[in-house]
């Protein structure tokens, strides 16, 4: 079996901001997101012992495509009581998506005489709406023009408020939404990081902890996610370049049968290298 996936999520912002006496800053934005996800799953069988007359192999392929557009609102504020201290908070509404799901299947059969036969299903389309969780963020940072900065951020995400709505044919997704409310809960996420300034060079490090989105009776399915990061950068006049590396570690337990007692454990490690360069003008 082979599974190929690809996708993208882009966002455009329309923002407005202001400040009072360079002590209190406030901003708001409208975000418009465009999402796309494609999946191709192929199952192949080959008859190697020649026990089936005139049959050699077949491929069964499933194609899926999810795409849509959504919008959200963000509101945030920063208070700077003294020059080196910043205290901030923000909220983000759910992102309200209008999505379309397309899928179809193909099957190819190959025979011993070299001939083949192919068949495809009709393309099926289903439209629906999705709202993502509400998010609240707060943070505090100590900054210095001489040595750099240290920051701490807290985020709360209410996964239980995710909802599916208004499917084609009057589908209301009541069982699915009941399952979301039963299985998912609120998660608390924590991030801490620092930047050390060494002339025109910058050294950075950070750590993040993301709680499981599952409620307590289901939280054995996924452990907390830990992310370690580090990097360095260089600044000169209007030019800058940054290098960063992050490693995420987490564990997931997936039911292999219908009961939660039958779980298979998978350990995940995700490494990312990021290089950024640019000019300011």
Per-segment meaning from a language model:
Residues 1-281:
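Outer-membrane beta-barrel porins/channels
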């Amino acid at each position: 079996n082979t599974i190929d996936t690809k996708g993208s999520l882009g966002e455009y912002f329309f923002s407005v901001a202001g400040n009072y006496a360079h002590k209190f800053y406030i901003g708001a934005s409208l975000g418009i997101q465009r999402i796309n996800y494609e999946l191709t799953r192929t199952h192949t069988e080959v008859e190697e012992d020649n026990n089936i007359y005139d049959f050699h192999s077949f491929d069964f392929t499933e194609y899926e495509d999810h795409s849509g557009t959504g919008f959200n609102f963000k509101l945030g504020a920063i208070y700077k009581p003294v020059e080196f201290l910043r205290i901030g908070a923000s909220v983000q509404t759910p992102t309200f998506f209008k999505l379309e799901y397309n899928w179809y299947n193909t099957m190819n059969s190959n025979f011993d005489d070299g001939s083949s036969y192919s068949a495809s299903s009709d393309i099926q389309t289903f439209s629906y709406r999705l709202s993502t969780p509400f998010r609240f963020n707060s943070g505090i940072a100590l900054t210095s023009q001489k040595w750099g900065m240290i920051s701490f951020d807290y985020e709360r995400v209410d996964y239980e408020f995710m909802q599916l709505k208004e499917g084609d044919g009057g589908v209301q997704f009541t069982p699915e939404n009941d399952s979301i409310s039963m299985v998912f809960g609120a998660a608390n996420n924590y991030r801490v990081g620092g930047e050390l300034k060494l002339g025109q060079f910058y050294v950075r490090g950070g750590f993040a902890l993301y709680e499981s989105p599952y409620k307590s009776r289901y939280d054995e399915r996924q452990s907390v996610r830990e992310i370690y990061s580090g990097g360095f950068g260089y600044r000169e006049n209007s030019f800058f370049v940054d290098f960063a590396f992050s490693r995420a570690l987490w564990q997931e337990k997936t039911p292999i049968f219908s009961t939660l007692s039958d779980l298979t454990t998978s350990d995940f490690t995700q490494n990312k290298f990021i290089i950024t360069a640019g000019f300011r003008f």
